[in-house]
A protein has these predicted regions:
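Residue-level recognition of strand-loop junctions within catalytic nucleotide-signaling folds
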Residues: 66-67, 97, 142, 183-185
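PLP-dependent enzyme catalytic core of the Aspartate aminotransferase-like
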Residues: 146-147, 155-165, 169-201
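Conserved glycine-rich beta-strand-loop-beta hairpin in the small C-terminal domain of fold type I
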Residues: 93, 109-118, 128-141, 174
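Single conserved hydrophobic/aromatic residue that forms the stacking wall/gate
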Residues: 1-11, 198-208
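Hydrophobic residues in well-ordered beta-strands that form the structural core
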Residues: 15-16, 82, 130, 164-166
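Conserved core segment of the aminotransferase class I/II
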Residues: 36, 40-111, 115-124
Length: 208
């Protein structure tokens, strides 16, 4: 991949968060940084069971990659605890060994929510590309609203009772976007789209 070229020349140490690796749609497979030539010399990759297996709060996952970095992490962790609660470890092992059908079910659920949201926004005149992975949808604010992300997010919350994340919270280049989380079922998503259409169908605020 083009993004991987010269990885070792740019970063001497790299930590890759692969939390959403299993939440992929339409045949897409999320890449691992460890696929990149030379990455195992400088990188480690973290995976959590929180997203793929609906185990948030269990604090269970694993790290793989550069042996020296993992050794340092293991030493550091040993200063804080002596291992995870055994039943949680057993549950994690069971999920990894026998949880493929459950992961597929989770993916299908998020795909349905993604399609409902993106199709709804596009029918309202937005131009939203369906993401190939994760439980989030980034949508560019249509120019007709003449607003940046924070102001638009406030209006959605105050006038339509719909909560989104303003893109500016992720950096200056996100200020023309808002981020939706696919945490509600299809019916609630349709309700949110209807409320948004009713309350902000026309531009009402000047761009800041």
């Amino acid at each position: 991949a083009s993004w991987s070229r010269g990885l070792g020349d740019v970063y001497k140490r790299q930590v890759h968060d692969l939390a959403y690796a299993d939440l992929c749609f339409d045949g897409y497979k999320a890449p691992s940084i460890l696929e990149v030539d030379g990455a195992k010399d400088i990188a480690v990759e973290f995976f959590t069971l929180s997203k793929s297996y609906n185990m948030p709060g269990w604090r269970i996952g694993f790290c793989c990659g550069n042996a020296e970095l993992i050794g340092a992490l293991a030493r550091l962790k040993s200063y804080f605890d002596y291992g995870h609660f055994t039943p949680v470890q057993v549950a994690g092992i069971e999920a990894l060994n026998n949880g493929d059908e459950y992961v597929e079910e989770i993916c299908n659920m998020y795909k349905s929510r993604r399609d409902t949201l993106c199709d709804g926004l596009n029918s309202m005149g937005w131009e939203v590309e369906k993401p190939k992975a994760t439980m989030f949808v980034w949508a560019k604010i249509p120019e007709r609203f003449n607003m940046k992300s924070l102001e638009f997010s406030k209006i959605l919350l105050e006038e339509a009772n719909v909560a989104v994340s303003p893109g500016i919270g992720f950096g200056e280049y996100g200020d023309d976007f808002i981020r939706f989380s696919l945490i509600e079922n299809d019916q609630r998503t349709k309700q949110a789209l209807k409320l948004s259409l009713i309350h902000i169908s026309e531009p009402t605020r000047p761009r800041s």
